[in-house]
Amino acid sequence: FDRAERGIELGYDADGRERGIALKNAVDDDAIFDVTAAISAVAAAGPVTVVGFCWGGSLAWRAATCLTGLAGAVSYYGGELPSKAGLISHCPVLAHFGERDKGIPMDGVNAFIKAQADADPAVEAHIYDADHGFNCDARGQYDAAAADLAWQRTLAFLERVRGTFS
């Protein structure tokens, strides 16, 4: 959200969510330019991966399908992924979804997984018995078991696509 409002920090209450949606809508498509700038800023240090949560998870998917030069992308509960099913990624992608996430219906997630399996085998997706935001311990939806498993899968994925991750 920094493109719209520098240094913004939002809570997970109704006001924070409402403000976050407004900021996302103000920035939306232009956010990929910020991702591109961030990638360029660190590219000389070695292979670059992007990891995003919620809208950031959608941006990670956009980066994987729109940009070249990434070693990999990880999306945690990216709400846009089902509507972008069938796109081909330019790098390996790991996607995490919560089965109880009311904002990302399972029929869309399952359609995304099937479309990607048919079109793009570089995409690996996992569904957890959890809600949206299951990885964030500051939220009521935090699910330690799902978060731990998703994080272990993320670290293994990062090692696979980048080499040793520390």
PLM segments and residue spans:
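N-terminal cap/leader regions of alpha/beta-hydrolase-fold enzymes
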Residues: 1-166
